[in-house]
Amino acid sequence: MIFKGKAHKYYDNIDTDVIIPARYLNTSDPNELAKHCLEDLDKEFVNKVQKGDILVAGKNFGCGSSREHAPIAIKACGVSCVIAKSFARIFYRNAINIGLPIVECEEAVDGIEAGDEVEVDLVNGIIKNLTKGKEFKAKPFPEFMQNIMKAGGLIEFVKGELKKDA
C-alpha cells in the first residue's frame, strides 16, 4: 500500500473534539462528518484537502474522548494516511478498525512541511518527502494489521475472512 499526496501539517495534542467537534456527533454519515473535519482548527481544511493528501501531526494525535467519528471524518474527507510523532492509543485502534492508514515517525514529521509532496509505503515503513528528497524509516505494521487496513477496516476484513471459510 503506497500513498502519495500533499502534506497538511498541524501540531501536538490534536484531540478528537478538534478533529470532529461534538456538535456533529449526532450523525454517523461519513460524508457529513467529512464536511466538518478539523473545522475548529483550520476553517479551510476541507476546501484545501484533496483526495490522497496526507495529514502530518505532532505528538499524541487523536487524544481525548474515544470517538470513531474522528478517524471516519479524516478518511471520508480524502486523507489517505496520517503521519504523527505519536497517536493516542484509542485513536490508533479506531483508525485501524475503520481502515485509516496511520504511521508513527518523529523524524518524518520533523522533516515534512505543509505543502510538501509525500509518499508513504505502508508495507515497508518508508516515508519519502518528494519535495525535499528525504527518506525516513518507520516501523511497518504487522501483516495482519496491514490486511485490516487494506480491507478497509476490521468489519470488512472479518467479512472477507468469513467468505473464505464459507
Swiss-Prot record:
Subunit structure: Heterodimer of LeuC and LeuD.
CDD domains the record matches: IPMI_Swivel
UniProt entry keywords in alphabetical sequence: Amino-acid biosynthesis, Branched-chain amino acid biosynthesis, Leucine biosynthesis, Lyase
Record's protein name: 3-isopropylmalate dehydratase small subunit
Annotated source species: Caldicellulosiruptor bescii (strain ATCC BAA-1888 / DSM 6725 / KCTC 15123 / Z-1320)
Record's function text: Catalyzes the isomerization between 2-isopropylmalate and 3-isopropylmalate, via the formation of 2-isopropylmaleate.
Single GO biological process annotation from the record: L-leucine biosynthetic process
GO molecular function annotations of the record: 3-isopropylmalate dehydratase activity
Residues passing through the membrane, by range: none
Pathway info: Amino-acid biosynthesis; L-leucine biosynthesis; L-leucine from 3-methyl-2-oxobutanoate: step 2/4
InterPro entries tied to this protein: Aconitase/3IPM_dehydase_swvl (IPR015928), AconitaseA/IPMdHydase_ssu_swvl (IPR000573), IPMI_Swivel (IPR033940), LeuD (IPR050075), LeuD/DmdB_bac (IPR011824), LeuD_type2/HacB/DmdB (IPR011827)
EC code(s) of this entry: 4.2.1.33
Pfam family, one: Aconitase_C
Family: Belongs to the LeuD family. LeuD type 2 subfamily.
Superkingdom of this protein's organism: Bacteria
Reactions the enzyme catalyzes: (2R,3S)-3-isopropylmalate = (2S)-2-isopropylmalate
